[in-house]
Amino acid sequence: MNPALLHAVQSANGVDLERAEDAARELLLALGEDPDRDGLRETPGRIAKAYAELLSPEPFSPTTFPNDEGYDELVIARGIQFNSLCEHHLLPFGGVAHVGYLPGDRIIGLSKLGRVVDLFARRLQVQERLTSEIAAWIDEHLEPKGVGVVIEAEHLCMSLRGVQKPGTLTATSALRGLVRDDPRTRQEFLALAARQT
């Protein structure tokens, strides 16, 4: 099992709020703003606390259970909403993750799939790595016959700045095991992930 993945679950993110607040104040000054004026006086502290919250995943215990029923079809949690921060611009991106697996000997509580998404989303990220990390975590902890993750997200670094194309969605996928290698299972997963409710 990958020690880095276990570490991510078991350790809390250490944030120096005082230092972050000082840095936010310096940023405001560098942008030509007066951090001592009425509207900005509390802003550096708010920025520090907001980023600390956005970048601190909730630790959880990855409880798994024996697959006593021998369930051998896909398990998919669709439309898991998430928000993250682009590591290039520190601007938010968010959307939905569709996470599925083909059980082997172990299964996991459905709520844990949402927690896994948050575990990796609540850090500085790029969407491609986020997608792969979620798939790797499920593969490591469950040892399923296959894993599929599809993420669709809007990036504010693309909507608010640069090309300024609001509403543009980026889709990424990470497929492993039979979800990648078996054409029928792959097609079923992708169809279920794309299905509109």
Name every feature range the model reports, one short phrase each.
Residues 1-197:
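A domain-level signal for the structural core that forms small-molecule/cofactor-binding pockets
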